[in-house]
Structure formats: C-alpha cells, structure tokens
A protein has these predicted regions:
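Short aromatic-rich membrane-water interface segments that cap or initiate transmembrane helices
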Residues: 2-21, 137-151
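Membrane-interface loop-to-helix entry segments
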Residues: 14-31, 106-107
Length: 326
C-alpha cells in the first residue's frame, strides 16, 4: 500500500522464510509470556495497562521482522524502544525501574538515530528503500564510497539494541522490570533486534574487512566480558542478563566471520537462545515468587520444593550449556 508516495515509499510486508521463523518466535514466545504474566502479576498491578503495552510491544517487534522497506523498519524499531521504556518502567514506584527504563530508552533511541542515518545512506546508494531492491544491490553498495559510513552507522544501531560492548550496560539495569517483561525482552524481543538487523542486511554489508572488524571484534569482546561478568552475579536475573549479553556476542561473532555457514549457525543459535532463555527467566520468576529471593546463595533444595520448575530450569540450562540433543 502507498505510504509516502512523494518519497516513493510503500507500506509492505516481506514474508520470506527468515521472516516467518522470526514471526513464529515473536508470537509463540509472546503468547506463552502473556499466559505466564496472567498468573505472575498480583491483583494490585494494573493488568490492562501491562497487557496493552505488552501487545503493542509485540506488534512493534512483528513490524520490524516483517518490514518490506528500510524506513518502515526504522519506524517500528523506534516503537520497540518506546514500548520497552513503558514496560521496563511498569513498576514506576521503584526508582531502579525508572532508571533502567530511562537508560534503555536513551541508549536504544540514540542507536536508532544512527541506524536511520545509515539507512538513508543505503537508500541513496541503492536508489530505493525497498528491501528487495536493497538486497539485490549488495555489490553496488559495497563499492560505493558511502559504504563505510553507512556500515558503521548501521552497526552502531545494532550494537546499542543488542547490548553489545560498549553499549551493554543498559541491559542489566532493565532487570528491574517485571519478570514477564525480562523473559520476553531477552528471548524474543528487543535485544534480538540488533543481530536480526545484521542478519537481514548480511547479504548487503558483509564480505569486507570493515564488516569483519566492526562486527566480529565487538561481538568477541562482548562474548568474553559478558561470560566473565556472569560468573560473579548472585542475582538470578542478573546472571541471566549477562549470559544474554554473552550469547548475543557469540551470535555477533558468527555474523562477523563473513561465512554463509557461520550465518546459518547464528540463525540457529538465535532460535535456540530464544527458547531456553524464556524458560530460564520464567523459572527465575517462579522461584522468586515462591521463595521471596533471587539470591542464589540463599537458594537450595528447590528440586524438592519445586520439582517441576527445577526440572524445566535444568533442561533449559542444559540447552544453554550446549548439551547434545538439547
């Protein structure tokens, strides 16, 4: 449908195999988190406001993964920043929630502006913002003098959204959000958008030394630092937050290798991470709800008092550790 005819922009959906997989992750895990939130939130929490923000957040995610042109993608990209701000700060009486929400909004919105500038450069080189035409113009874009600034701006936007070094600091502060928000944010929602963007534009921007060093190096540093920081966390959600940073760093490293096989591995791990991280966050929320603490130094014997939750958490943790067949 015509969106901004004067600029030659059309509102369109791109329903290729990659988009279908992402849409299933966004809606499938979103549906499970909605069910979980129904029983997790207390009667004192304003549920209509929560579910309105959450469903709008989910719709914005779908808008990004199904976008048929780059301007449309950036619009929904910024909407995810807005609704994540409202969800992270849902318990606005908590100063930590307000601080985490502001930090997430500032970092990701600034990255969104960088992405917008990069998209404008890509559109100028390709002569169109339509994703089909952009993906077909990879050789033209890589040969253009504007390729390097466009690449750096797009990568900057992706790194801020996926909490990659040196922009990783906002994600642990977002753990002040309700657990359903954390589960969705880490597994199928906003922090995945950066690596999803790099995957979507991989045919256009990859294949150069600039791509390998800007993407691969940032991912490698994030992968190592995230894993190191996770070892010293005592809060369950904090530990999972840093593990998310590390896993996204691993995905980013794979994308930076300029290898089609590494791209396939990155997409597979994206799906795997979405599944086990949602499970682990919901298990952490159940443990906190029943025991009153997320401090792992004070938790023991859960396999006896919460056998179902403990079993689900162990299976998800085994998947995170890369145990075969999981």
């Amino acid at each position: 449908a015509d969106w901004l005819p004067a600029l030659g922009l059309r509102f369109s959906l791109r329903m290729d195999g990659f988009a279908w997989v992402l849409a299933l992750i966004v809606t499938g895990i979103g549906f499970l988190v909605v069910l979980y939130a129904r029983y997790y939130l207390s009667a004192a929490d304003p549920m209509p406001r929560f579910f309105a923000f959450f469903l709008a957040f989910m719709a914005s995610m779908l808008g990004v993964v199904l976008a048929g042109n780059l301007i449309q993608l950036v619009l929904f990209w910024e909407l995810t920043s807005l609704f994540s701000f409202l969800l992270i700060g849902y318990w606005h009486h908590n100063p930590a929630a307000r601080e985490g929400a502001r930090m997430a909004l500032i970092v990701t919105s600034a990255g969104g502006l960088a992405l917008f500038a990069g998209v404008l450069l890509i559109g100028r080189i390709a002569g169109s913002y339509d994703l089909d035409r952009v993906l077909a113009a990879g050789d033209l874009i890589r040969a253009d003098p504007l390729y390097l600034p466009a690449l750096l701006l797009v990568v900057l936007g992706a790194l801020t959204k996926s909490a990659q070094f040196p922009f990783h600091f906002w994600l642990p502060h977002a753990m002040a959000a309700p657990t359903p928000v954390s589960a969705y944010l880490h597994s199928a929602a906003m922090v995945k958008l950066g690596v999803i963007l790099l995957m979507r534009l991989w045919p256009v921007l990859s294949g150069t030394d600039a791509w390998m060093f800007s993407v691969g190096l940032a991912g490698l540093v994030t992968f190592v630092l995230g894993a190191y920081a996770a070892m010293f966390q005592h809060d369950l959600k904090g530990l999972l937050a840093y593990s998310t940073i590390s896993h996204l760093g691993l995905i980013t490293v794979l994308l930076g290798l300029n290898s089609p096989l590494a791209l396939v591995a990155a997409i597979f791990h994206l799906m795997n991470h979405a599944t086990f991280k949602a499970s682990l966050f919901m298990a952490a929320g159940a443990i906190d709800h029943e025991s009153g603490t997320r401090d792992i130094r004070r938790l023991s014997g859960l396999v006896h008092s919460m056998p179902i939750t403990a079993t689900a958490a162990m299976v998800a943790a085994a998947a995170m550790a890369g145990v075969p067949l999981l």
